[in-house]
Amino acid sequence: DIPHKWSWVRLGELFQHNTGKALNSSNTSGTKMQYITTSNMYWDRFELTHLKEMVFTDSEVVKCTVKKGDLLVCEGGDIGRSAIWCFDYPMRIQNHIHRLRPYTTISVKFYYYIFFLYKQTGLIGGKGIGIQGLSSNALHKLLFPLPPLSEQYRIVEAIETVFAQLDSILTSVS
């Protein structure tokens, strides 16, 4: 159950969704550009020291480019692993990454934490109980809570306060 001021919504009501480009050695038209794969993505961060390159046409650049504030979600591997693109420059993505771009003002960080919750509870990527892969169709079937915007921000602040306290405790004992 959720509070009465909240509602349940499907992903497509909150985010415009695309996946990246599949690597195809026969595709040689376009411009060679760097892109990220699931191996560059970790929970809440990116490792960008070893980027791959492939050729992108102009239309693929539009479809496969992420910009600051986009929520990226892994389709396979560590299914549901998510991070928010926080850089001031665009980047392309390969096909095993979902790009979620909000239609309107929402706390993208709140939905990052929802993906973290869904992963930790086995709703996605679980052992036989949740969604095993995160295809576009599977992603679109997921329900997400939609609290008022002020509550989204308050919840994120509370989560980050607790995580900061945990980090402080871990630092003091190590």
Name each model feature, range by range.
Residues L142-P145:
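Long, hydrophobic alpha/beta structural blocks
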Residues D1-K21, L149-E157, T161-S174:
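Non-catalytic DNA-recognition/assembly elements of restriction-modification systems
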Residues D78, L117-Q120, T161, Q165-S168:
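Short, well-ordered loop/turn and helix-capping segments at boundaries between secondary-structure elements
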Residues G12-S25, S39-K68:
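Sequence-specific dsDNA recognition surfaces
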Residues N24-K32, H50, G125-I129:
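Short coil/turn segments at secondary-structure boundaries
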Residues W8, W43-R45, G80-S82, A164:
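Flexible loop/turn segments at secondary-structure boundaries
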Residues H4-W6, F15, N40, G77, ...:
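Short, flexible loop/turn elements at secondary-structure junctions
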